[in-house]
């Protein structure tokens, strides 16, 4: 009987570790800044980002601003050529669409593709911007939106 109890406890512990390992917790901190061809960008270096300057292009709640997106990847990742960017606030599961079906441009500023955009987020706090090329998530950028 002791063997079965030990086996059951071991299996439960193993199952718990498996479930814990599969849980992906997101880090709601502003994405890293990086340089590409002399431009400072916010995002994931060599994957996804947009030109960003914390003084000039900082996000303020309800204010629109221009942002040049840059994408890095293999040619087949850009077959769809249309980009959608959805935004989610850290305190709310509701998603809003910031960019819907905009076409990617050619290489620019060291990136494989680029895309100009106008974006505005409605309230302050941390936001996750999910950028899709076609139906595939290309990456996520976390931004802080300030009160004016």
Question: Which positions does each model-derived feature cover?
Answer:
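C-terminal motif of bacterial Sec signal peptides marking the signal peptidase cleavage site
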Residues: 18-21
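Short, aromatic- and glycine-rich surface loops/edge beta-strands on solvent-exposed regions
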Residues: 127-133
């Amino acid at each position: 009987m002791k063997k079965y109890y030990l086996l059951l406890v071991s299996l439960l512990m193993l199952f718990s570790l498996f479930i814990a390992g599969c849980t992906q917790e997101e880090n709601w901190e502003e994405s890293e800044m990086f340089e590409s061809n002399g431009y400072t960008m916010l995002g994931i270096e060599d994957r996804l980002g947009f030109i960003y300057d914390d003084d000039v292009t900082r996000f303020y709640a309800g204010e629109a601003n221009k942002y040049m997106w840059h994408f890095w990847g293999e040619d087949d990742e850009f077959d769809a050529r249309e980009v959608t960017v959805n935004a989610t606030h850290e305190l709310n599961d509701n998603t809003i669409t910031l960019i819907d079906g905009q076409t990617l441009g050619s290489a620019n500023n060291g990136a494989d593709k680029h895309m100009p955009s106008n974006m505005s987020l409605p309230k302050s706090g941390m936001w996750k911007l999910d950028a899709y090329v076609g139906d595939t998530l290309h990456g996520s950028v976390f931004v802080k939106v300030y009160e004016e």
